[in-house]
């Protein structure tokens, strides 16, 4: 089945683009917007409406495969590609990318995705095409291969990487945003496997001595017991955005720090706990050093809390560096930051055989189409967990990702059933 054409149309993403540096520099939030001037290149305001570029690949039989070019909320920060503007990159996809893909065999996802990954970067100003372009077009290529072959995208990825896909839904990870109590209770009622994120992104929220986070975990444990279905064994996952580093500071293997993590474990009990982004060391190598120091300190003290890499773990090479250094129990695979969707699968698989698990993450600023593609990455690689996305409302993203996995598993089960002899 040949690719006939590639078309695009500008669309919307599930959240907003935020100028992270301006916010860190003290921009004042007024209602939902921020006062002040942006400081990151490409921004006209500190908070702007999210954009996506909808990609359609037309196959020889007239069928259409779709993907969405999307970028993270904090675009342009931390060495990421520039702020993604759909209209700016539309000619890139409909021009050089489309020219390269027309006539290609749609069933050959691996070859097509590799060609896209290696395309000339002249319009993006970096070493490759903009990550959002590679992300969206590769989703369409994945769907095109699945349609041409009459299988699920999970099967395409499993065949490409010779994996045994998960046979049940990968645990979905819900994020609460600032509505950390109301949304957590929603998650508990629905039996979400991993929750609640919590958005602990300031000392005010965490507490000057960390008491705010500890009290929240104790509340969450009580509510999980009261509201969760039977049986229910969730895993607690909170993101502290480096704030514990501000509260305690290095070295992170000292008794004061490990004792505090033990109080977090006790507050969360009987549910297991993982803490994302405990500190922000300002650079990848420094972050790896401090994360490893904390992880070793917790192990030596017998504190059973998992540490999750987030800050300075954006690209495939970053994931490799954290895993090789044994600096985390779990790494987030930030799908839009890796470019082609196949790179996310490769990043998860890099963790196989190591002491580090991987979760298929991403951003609230994605789309339904990209979230569904990531659900197949999680299934094909049997990831530790997968983010509920897009948006910050929780319910919608949880529905999208959960239903996509259930559909894929049901279809795979049906096609693998052997009919009985007459």
Curated annotation (Swiss-Prot):
UniProt KW Endoplasmic reticulum keyword: no
UniProt-listed Enzyme Commission number(s): 4.3.1.2
Active site: 334
Keywords linked to the UniProt accession: Lyase, Magnesium, Metal-binding
CDD domains: MAL (cd03314)
Names of required cofactors: Mg(2+)
Site positions (Transition state stabilizer): 197
Known catalytic reactions: (2S,3S)-3-methyl-L-aspartate = mesaconate + NH4(+)
GO molecular function, one term: metal ion binding
Pathway terms, separated by semicolons: Amino-acid degradation; L-glutamate degradation via mesaconate pathway; acetate and pyruvate from L-glutamate: step 2/4
Pfam families in the record: MAAL_C, MAAL_N
Residues that hold (2S,3S)-3-methyl-L-aspartate according to the record: 175, 332, 363-364
Binding annotation for Mg(2+): 239, 276, 310
Family statement drawn from the similarity comment of this UniProt entry: Belongs to the methylaspartate ammonia-lyase family.
Role noted for this protein: Involved in the methylaspartate cycle. Catalyzes the formation of the alpha,beta-unsaturated bond by the reversible anti elimination of ammonia from L-threo-beta-methylaspartate (L-threo-(2S,3S)-3-methylaspartate) to give mesaconate.
Quaternary state and interactors: Homodimer.
Protein known as: Methylaspartate ammonia-lyase
